[in-house]
Amino acid sequence: RRADVLVEDEKILRVARSISAPEATVIDVEGQLLLPGFIDAHTHFDLDVCSTTTADDFFSGSRSALRGGTTTVVDFACPNKGETLHQGLELWHRKADGSCCCDYGFHMTIDDWNPGIEAEIDDMYAAGISSFKMYMTYPAMMIGDEAMYHALKKLREKGGICGVHCENSGVIDALIAEKKAAGEMGVGSHPRTRPDFLEAEAVSRLLRIAQA
């Protein structure tokens, strides 16, 4: 429908067929579609993983997001192995603060479990983080089954959200070794070292652990 939109302090105050606001600045977009800013809830900016760094940092990635109509990104704060959740969150804030062109938030990666990390979960909630990520592969980030069980149990108590990257790391490593030994190092070998049945096995294992 055709309408005027009154905005103040980044909030929509009113939508009506015709709005009189003499003190307002008028931006004429007649004939255009007016959409709310999109939210990209899965970005990996400035992430060091598998001996490389993702293509975009917070500046270039958020700038591209804005050009496409995305005004909020939710990235994954990833502590280095042995670090606390607080240290991981502080590191990602340093990467984003002053560089990100749009609004941003974080999911928190859990790669281990101990009494300190368990206590930090409450702190993450206090900091506005209620969604978490765990990896069943990638040595620098992966979590073991025992730790994953305890983490899922805690997040269930908190009513949190947990995303899990589901793959069977051990079998993937075995398949990679076989391809290397056969000299099959091309891009085409990548999906063959990560067949779908390994994802299915990991998803099944995750669900059974979560239901324990």
Give names to the regions the model predicted.
Residues A24, A77, E83-L85, P115-G116, ...:
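Short Asp/Glu-rich motifs
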Residues R1-P36:
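Histidine-rich, glycine-flanked metal-binding segment
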Residues V26, I39, F132:
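Receiver (REC) domain switch-region micro-motif
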Residues A77-C78, G88-C102, A151-R156, A182-S189:
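Short, structured secondary-structure boundary patches
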Residues T52-T53, T84, D112, I143, ...:
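Residues that cap or flank secondary-structure elements
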Residues G116-A212:
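Histidine/acidic residue-rich metal-binding segments in metalloenzymes
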Residues V29-S99, G116:
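Metal-associated gating/positioning segment near the N- to mid-region
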Residues F59-E83, D97-D112, A127-A140, G159-G163, ...:
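Divalent metal-dependent hydrolysis catalytic cores, especially in the metallo-beta-lactamase
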